[in-house]
Curated annotation (Swiss-Prot):
GO terms for molecular function: NADH dehydrogenase (ubiquinone) activity; ubiquinone binding. It catalyses: a plastoquinone + NADH + (n+1) H(+)(in) = a plastoquinol + NAD(+) + n H(+)(out); a plastoquinone + NADPH + (n+1) H(+)(in) = a plastoquinol + NADP(+) + n H(+)(out). InterPro entries: NADH_Q_OxRdtase_chain4, NADH_Q_OxRdtase_chainM/4, NADH_UbQ_OxRdtase, ND/Mrp_TM. Pfam families: Proton_antipo_M. The gene is ndhD. This is NAD(P)H-quinone oxidoreductase chain 4, chloroplastic. GO terms for biological process: aerobic respiration; ATP synthesis coupled electron transport; electron transport coupled proton transport. It comes from the Eukaryota. PANTHER family: NAD(P)H-QUINONE OXIDOREDUCTASE CHAIN 4, CHLOROPLASTIC, NADH-UBIQUINONE OXIDOREDUCTASE CHAIN 4. Coiled coil: none annotated. One of its GO terms (cellular component) is plastid.
């Protein structure tokens, strides 16, 4: 076990190096872009090295532990550590943030502040996934709000201020319940705050209090995931945000809610989770159907993709609620799979919108003729999103299906009903995605704009798309590569904390 503070370096490096952006010489945006890209690549290489040489996959315990006193008055510690549940999310964060930085290449207005905010988000996300202290977890959760709000309000569409305000109100409202839960758990049974996750795992609570804690945390996660009916900020936000910001929102930010649900609610509040799990499964099934049906009625293709994200989050909720090894591993696989696919669909939608200056499907048609590369990649990732066999979306949804079917928690008839509802959702998914492709790319040329405006994808964009397409295919063909990260930790979590 290495005593070197790898995780502290990974958390602090992006925001510290990002603050130096403002001291770079004023010689255009090129220096700022390459500096930011270098920081992202260095961070990603460091985390890859640390995990390859200092992390044992077969060990289900917390590794790379760090514990230092931070604020002595409150007995507040800087506690970090990772296990199989957080490893995949951290690697996804490093990979997607690096590519989102590459996607943000065209941003020229206030580019120093833009790239600094992206790096600040990077630090917050790595900090959240590696946090082993409840208050530190909350601080990292909140650290996301300011960068995202500024990225939305300064580099968005016409209704960017409305979307940014809606986002901050929803997430800040959920955070109030989160903070109450953190303080309640930390101060329960003691005058001194006890916020170490290792100690809180063994803490027992009265049934009513545990349910209240669980529900408070669930509201905060329901906003970020999102879970209906707290999802309405998402379509507005994705409809207005710059596509590089959308990549971080869809690829990482939504997954923070799912990670919190597993790390806090499942691990620390097992009895309440056992009671709530049937409701999670029911809500997840309803969400798949509702969001897929709503997506079909969207005229704005960015909002259609946003509702498809809400629908796919339903599979994660069902996997978490199934309380099985297979189901929870399927949920983690879906977190990574949708992180790749959802982020790329928003990138493609954003680049297409920048070229066409049109977002309404009835105004489009025949776009495949001037932009064949965008058409090819849009079609490929749409196939991945609708769970085409051989791609990561298919494997993730199939594993969640098996997790629900094999769950001893549910009787046969409820299982059959929920499986039937999920199947209907899987039928609706190709309907809204293929109809979007047909309206955008096929048919006659409905818009009246000169061809010069419609340049196809350049080398930078194609490189980015291929970088994401390779893991989507790789996970679809050999999912054990990802499942091996979490399978031992999931087994330990479920065997230790759940009634048989």
């Amino acid at each position: 076990m290495s005593s070197f503070p790898w995780l502290t370096i990974l958390v602090v490096l992006p925001i510290f190096a990002g603050s130096l952006i403002f001291f770079l010489p004023h010689r255009g945006n090129k220096i700022v872009r390459w500096y930011t890209m270098s920081i992202c690549l260095l961070e990603f290489l460091l985390m890859t090295y640390a995990f390859c040489y200092h992390f044992q996959l077969e060990d289900p315990l917390i590794q790379l532990k760090e514990d230092s006193k931070w604020i002595d008055v409150f007995n507040f510690h800087w506690r970090l550590g990772i296990d199989g549940l957080s490893l995949g999310s951290i690697l996804l964060t490093g990979f997607m943030t690096t590519l989102a930085t590459l996607a943000a290449w065209p941003v020229t207005r206030n580019s120093r502040l833009f790239y600094f905010l992206m790096l600040a988000m990077y630090s917050g996300q790595i900090g959240l996934f590696s946090s082993r202290d409840l208050l530190l977890f909350f601080i990292m959760w909140e650290l996301e709000l300011i960068p995202v709000y500024l990225l939305l309000s300064m580099w968005g569409g016409k209704r960017r201020l409305y979307s940014a305000t809606k986002f901050i109100l929803y997430t800040a409202g959920g955070s109030i319940f989160f903070l109450i839960g953190v303080l309640g758990m930390g101060l329960y049974g003691s005058n001194e705050p006890r916020l170490d996750l290792e100690r809180l795992i063994n803490q027992s609570y009265p049934a009513t209090l545990e349910i209240l804690f669980y529900f408070g945390f669930l509201i905060a996660y329901a906003v970020k995931l999102p879970i209906i009916p707290l999802h309405t900020w998402l379509p507005d936000t994705h409809g207005e945000a710059h596509y590089s910001t959308c990549m971080l929102l869809a690829g990482i930010l939504l997954k923070m809610g799912a990670y919190g649900l597993i790390r806090i609610n499942m691990e620390l509040l097992p009895h309440a989770h056992y009671l709530f799990s049937p409701w999670l499964v029911i809500i997840g099934a309803m969400q798949i159907i509702y969001a897929a049906s709503t997506s079909l009625g969207q005229r704005n293709f960015k909002k259609r993709i946003a509702y498809s994200s809400v629908s796919h989050m339903g599979f994660i909720i069902i996997g978490i609620g199934s309380i099985t090894n297979i189901g929870l591993n399927g949920a983690i696989l879906q977190i990574l799979s949708h992180g790749f696919i959802g982020a790329t669909l928003f990138f493609l939608a954003g680049t297409a919108c920048d070229r066409m200056r049109l977002v309404y499907l009835e105004e489009l048609g025949g776009v495949s003729i001037p932009m064949p590369k965008i058409f090819t990649m849009f079609s490929s990732f749409s196939m991945a999103s609708l769970a085409l066999p051989g791609m990561s979306g298919f494997v993730a949804e199939l594993v969640v299906f098996f997790g629900l079917i094999t769950s001893p928690k549910f009787l046969l008839m409820p299982k059959m009903l929920i499986t039937f509802v999920m199947a209907i959702g899987m039928i609706l998914t190709p309907i809204y995605l293929l109809s979007m492709l047909r309206q955008m790319f096929y048919g006659y040329k409905l818009f009246h704009v000169p061809n010069e405006n419609f340049e196809d994808s350049g080398p930078r964009e194609l490189f980015l798309l291929i970088c994401i397409f390779l893991p989507v295919i790789g996970i679809g063909i050999y999912p054990d590569f990802v499942l091996s990260l979490s399978v031992d930790r999931v087994e330990a979590l479920l065997s230790n904390y759940y009634p048989k």
